Amino acid sequence: MLPRGSRVRTRQEHALVGRSGRRVRAGSIVVHSVQTDVDGPPRAGFVVGRRVGNAVVRNRVRRRLREQTRSRLSSLPPGTAVLIRALPDAAGSSSADLGRSLDSAFRTVRSPRPQRSARSG
């Protein structure tokens, strides 16, 4: 279980991160991230929809994601909020696969966004 201060808990927080955040797909997960308050610890929330499987499968995927995230959350900058959404393929993924996907996504989240060039036209 993640500590209380390290969780995205409310519906408003989930909506903020999901709608206005940066989105990164890695393997069988999608990670939405947004920089919130600078002083707070990094926080994580999880979304595992019905398309992933029945309740037993969804809870297993959520537990695996939570455990893999717990050890990696401190690698994110302070004040970062992430929402980790499992895709249907996550049901067949091992914990190691989910961990590799999280590593890849978190690497992208930590990197600065590339500047978009202005289009002429």
Curated annotation (Swiss-Prot):
One of its GO terms (molecular function) is tRNA binding. Keywords: Endonuclease, Hydrolase, Nuclease, RNA-binding, tRNA processing. GO terms for cellular component: ribonuclease P complex. GO terms for biological process: tRNA 5'-leader removal. It catalyses: Endonucleolytic cleavage of RNA, removing 5'-extranucleotides from tRNA precursor. It is an enzyme of class 3 (hydrolase). Residues 1-20, 91-121 are annotated as: Disordered. InterPro entries: Ribosomal_Su5_D2-typ_SF, Ribsml_uS5_D2-typ_fold_subgr, RNase_P, RNase_P_CS. Its EC number is 3.1.26.5. Pfam families: Ribonuclease_P. Belongs to the RnpA family. Consists of a catalytic RNA component (M1 or rnpB) and a protein subunit. RNaseP catalyzes the removal of the 5'-leader sequence from pre-tRNA to produce the mature 5'-terminus. It can also cleave other RNA substrates such as 4.5S RNA. The protein component plays an auxiliary but essential role in vivo by binding to the 5'-leader sequence and broadening the substrate specificity of the ribozyme. This is Ribonuclease P protein component. The gene is rnpA.
